[in-house]
């Protein structure tokens, strides 16, 4: 019987394979009879226009669609500059060789394409901003970050944060797929710019929201890079190596490799690099310091994969290893406002941080049938690092010195974390639109750290601490969410019912020891610290539970859609603290939050829309904020946790409008948002007579308000060769806190520091304005770009009634000359001027230049680059708190030059034909190929 069953099964498999057929043909230009390369071919189901398979013609105009099941289909053949070709075909029991397909020219499209530079820089498609990458020229060996810096409305900070028209980008996708789990710098600083066709800025829904059609709290603003169609089958990448010297005769080097293996929708990318020029090509392994705070040396290697196994199963993931070493040197000033008094402090700090990190993430999507989708996502992370720092400081009250001192710290840490998410979605064939979705996830983390601290402070007396602290913590969480979607009287009216549960268990142990041996810090041996410090040691256990009950309604019309919902979120917190003296204190807290949520979107057309949305969200305090134990590692700032904290609850509302004019290629978009937070987590600061502050996180009884907005306009002018862009940002923010001066806090009393007295209410209100203008001129032989930025900030604190204003002016210009013999000259210059930054008001002019020579039949590029030729680069930051304004100046990389060589790996469609030859033979060049695939809207879910 068993053998019979196996035989029958094999027979069915064989019959299914035999039933699959091949469709092939050749595409020609109807006017000259020449075969057409890189023409897009799509096969759709005749019943519902579902895409079954796609292909592109080769250099002979030939295409083949493999393993097509019998049935009725629509074949669509399209290429820019030609009219589409459509043919209804029926596949039965034999292969089909269609007659030659003749594409006729689209006269109107050709007129537009004949004028070079007519491609719009920016197109608005609903809620998606789409930049045309080929409208922006970059160096031959440029990476994606170089391309992003040229896009109107895009800003990249020194820390690598990307904002588009004032909105922060959270993650990166490539062709709709995860690339190193959204690690922004892994994509922007490794991928070659010339592979990119479109840059799409959009809001990415979570996997569950894509399956249910109802948005949740996990929607993020992302960038999706679509690759050029001729880069989707083959091997391509860049290998770059360079070396040079800086002004201090220190060797500077930069080596990087990125190789991509593409097979349609399946892709594998290998990245590796090492440098000491502050180019952090991954956010992983960085530790707590910023990308450009000081001098950084990094090494990284990673592998990313997305594989379409078959129609039912997709698999992907990534693994990476990163190491970084950072040396930072900072000078900072801080002005703290108290009632009737002002504290000023000046600090000098040096630090060395060394960090290693390894990550593995896997992901799979299985569709056992057309009604069921299963997604699983495991991940694990390991991190270890060491740190050393030295700090000296001086504090003044009303310009009189109150204390001064120095501190030395050294430590190490290790942590491991992981998680697993499982999503199951089931549609019901008995009623279209009905679905049941379950999302279950769990995660854990464990960490251990050791810190050695030697500090002394001089005020009215001298205080010295010589201590060793060991911290261990572990965390485990389980989350479950079930959604049932039910169409009402028709598919335009849909109701979603959601039940969710979240549980988090945390345990944190802190043991502190002191030593009278003054050499103990230099030895850094825990055994030298033999005095257990009860007041600064404890064991904290915390359990947090949250239940969510949610009801959402969605109404959809062709022109508009509406979603309304209500959510109730009860939460319970149970904690117990075991102190070093053996005593323990329990704590229990229960709260409930109610929040409506809604969204309304009106589509005036495919290129114009208006949206209004609102959402409420709960944020749980961290263990460090809740753990009720004193921390004296900083003699001028002692902290203690607050186990009585409530979760904060934010109310967020936003208005968005976008439009695109197809006649003028002009784009307009604007957004305004507001956020009000209930029970916001703020800081309570108590100052003693020496300027030392005791701090504790508390819930604010005021409602912090944040209002922000942006207006963007982009249009081509002067025969569409010159592009103009303006982006305006406005903001209003209030920060609350509590502050009290000259209070005598009994440091030896555990009860006193745990129940820190509440200070006077302090708040800082801040107005901000930013205007950015840009012009770009593009020609075959020359490109000129100019960008101007003005930023204004106005800050007022209620305790000092003192106004703080800062002004920033930045003018950026770049020029590219393409000379004979494959030589390119590049130069960019940035002028910036700062006013209002305390002692750091300075001007700087940053001038970079390079000359590139293409060799080896355009596969290699030899470059000479000079960075910061005038030696003026600064690194200054401003930070505004509820009762303070601070300014920090970091050390930065000095001027240097570098000679480098880059080699481009190109092998497409089984041919080793040079990529530049391909583009010279192409009828319209690189900027005129069909668009890449758009990310899925509500229906797809492979872009996570």
Report the location of each language-model feature:
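Membrane-proximal, glycine/serine-rich, low-complexity loop/turn segments characteristic
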Residues: 20, 60-62, 76, 83, ...
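Short, ordered, surface-exposed loop/turn motifs in non-cytosolic proteins
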Residues: 31-45, 122-124
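Short Pro-Gly-centered beta-turn/loop motif in secreted/extracellular proteins
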Residues: 36-37, 64-72, 80
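A short, solvent-exposed loop/turn motif at the edges and junctions
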Residues: 45-50, 72-88
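Short, acidic Ser/Thr/Gly-rich low-complexity loop/linker segments typical of extracellular
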Residues: 46-62
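Outer-membrane beta-barrel translocator domains and adjoining extracellular loop/strand segments
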Residues: 212-213, 281-287, 327-344, 352, ...
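Outer membrane beta-barrel strand-and-loop segments of large Gram-negative receptors
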Residues: 348, 477-479, 531-537, 640, ...
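Signature of Gram-negative outer-membrane beta-barrel scaffolds
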Residues: 494-608, 797
